[in-house]
Amino acid sequence: MVTVEDIRRAQRAEGPATVMAIGTATPENCVDQSTYPDYYFRITNSEHRTDLKEKFKRMCEKSMIRKRYMHLTEEFLKENPNMTAYMAPSLDARQDIVVVEVPKLGKEAAQKAIKEWGQPKSKITHLVFCTTSGVDMPGADYQLTKLLGLRPSVKRFMMYQQGCFAGGTVLRMAKDLAENNAGARVLVVCSEITAVTFRGPSESHLDSLVGQALFGDGAAAVIVGSDPVVGVERPLFQLVSAAQTILPDSDGAIDGHLREVGLTFHLLKDVPGLISKNIEKSLKEAFGPLGISDWNSVFWIAHPGGPAILDQVEAKLGLKPEKLRSTRHVLGEYGNMSSACVLFILDEMRKSSAKEGMSSTGEGLDWGVLFGFGPGLTVETVVLHSVPINN
């Protein structure tokens, strides 16, 4: 007689969840950060606000961002002046864009990941889709299933309105799915388009202006599964553990509200301080069981909320400058793409590790950490193990 325990044992995978492929995509429209203040104040009819423009210029200069990609073009914004005002009803116009474009950009990234994975898409058993850009029913997960031609029986999870920490959340969810379902292959997609948050400047809300200096568009996809098929599937990173926590005394530090005017973001100045003050506790909880307490001995993938967060984390933990190299590279080349960022950094790290002849996908190191920070303040901590590179 078969018992429930027997069935349960057979349902579980044997090994840890692994990232098997990564794909990324951006809109074609590329924006140069050095000329963006002139463009932004022109397109929002705000050139008369010279003091505010000077402040914005300084924000852009300090951002450490070289360029960003944006779906919104100058032509489109000229035709939709409500989206260039600071607080004009414009949700319908914004929704019309993102409901269509978020799944499409996600498809581009997913196709690249599926191609690298090397298996037929019919073997995808689960889909986890995450976006902070727009809300619809049926969701972006449904639209992507149709766009990619996935099986109708694929098990879908849709995560809307989570914000910048969610790149860690999707990996945590994919890990649980892969390890608890033998043979599961989870397609994870984060797709973000700033059409919901773009707005003109305001003297009274400089935190909104910070977002306009940082946010960019992008989508990233990964395939996650346990027990890779030898010779067919090539693991890149193992997902060893995952945790989420709400930081103490951080209520209201980062808020986002969906209104008639679109998605409004509100930031407190002490966000970098709150994160850097509490980050070591998360590290100790994650790496204590492994006997690791030297934060320079692990590779780093941190959501680049902005340069101030990275600078303060680096200073607080005494990190060597090269630790956040991949993180800063992605911030510089793409800006803050919310949930998609950490997956872009994961991709950058494995590529640069191979290119530079390092012994593992984690810059030659075995253990690594992936951090997501976002509204709450919520922090996601994922412990990674690299895979040897056969150079």
From Swiss-Prot:
The active site is at 164. It comes from Perilla frutescens. This is Chalcone synthase. It comes from the Eukaryota. Pathway: Secondary metabolite biosynthesis; flavonoid biosynthesis. Its EC number is 2.3.1.74. The gene is CHS. The primary product of this enzyme is 4,2',4',6'-tetrahydroxychalcone (also termed naringenin-chalcone or chalcone) which can under specific conditions spontaneously isomerize into naringenin. It is an enzyme of class 2 (transferase). It catalyses: (E)-4-coumaroyl-CoA + 3 malonyl-CoA + 3 H(+) = 2',4,4',6'-tetrahydroxychalcone + 3 CO2 + 4 CoA. The keyword Transcription regulation does not apply. Pfam families: Chal_sti_synt_C (PF02797), Chal_sti_synt_N (PF00195). SUPFAM superfamilies: Thiolase-like (SSF53901). Keywords: Acyltransferase, Flavonoid biosynthesis, Transferase. The keyword Coiled coil does not apply. PANTHER family: CHALCONE SYNTHASE 1, HYDROXYMETHYLGLUTARYL-COA SYNTHASE. One of its GO terms (molecular function) is naringenin-chalcone synthase activity. Belongs to the thiolase-like superfamily. Chalcone/stilbene synthases family. GO terms for biological process: flavonoid biosynthetic process; polyketide biosynthetic process. Gene3D superfamilies: 3.40.47.10.
